[in-house]
Swiss-Prot record:
The lineage of its organism: Eukaryota, Metazoa, Ecdysozoa, Arthropoda, Hexapoda. One of its GO terms (biological process) is innate immune response. This is Ceratotoxin-C. It comes from Ceratitis capitata. Residues 1-23 form the signal peptide. Residues 24-35 form a propeptide. Its main location: secreted. The keyword Secreted applies. Homomer of four to six subunits. It is found in: Secreted. Female-specific peptides with potent activity against Gram-positive and Gram-negative bacteria. They have as well hemolytic activity. Thermostable. Still active at 100 degrees Celsius.
Amino acid sequence: MANIKAVFLICIVAFIAFHCVVAEPTAEDSVVVKRSLGGVISGAKKVAKVAIPIGKAVLPVVAKLVG
C-alpha cells in the first residue's frame, strides 16, 4: 500500500511540475496561479481515479518478479 501512495505522490508532483512549465503562470498574476493550481488538483484527481486501479493491478505482478 505504501508503494501505491508513493507512486501516486510522484505522479501528482510530476503533473504539477509539468503543468507549471507548460502554463508558465507569472508571480504577480495570482488569479492565474490559483486557477492553474485548481486545474492541476482537479486533473490530478482524474488521473488518480485511473492510476490507482492500474497500480493495484500491477503491484502483485511486480512483487512476483522482484520477490
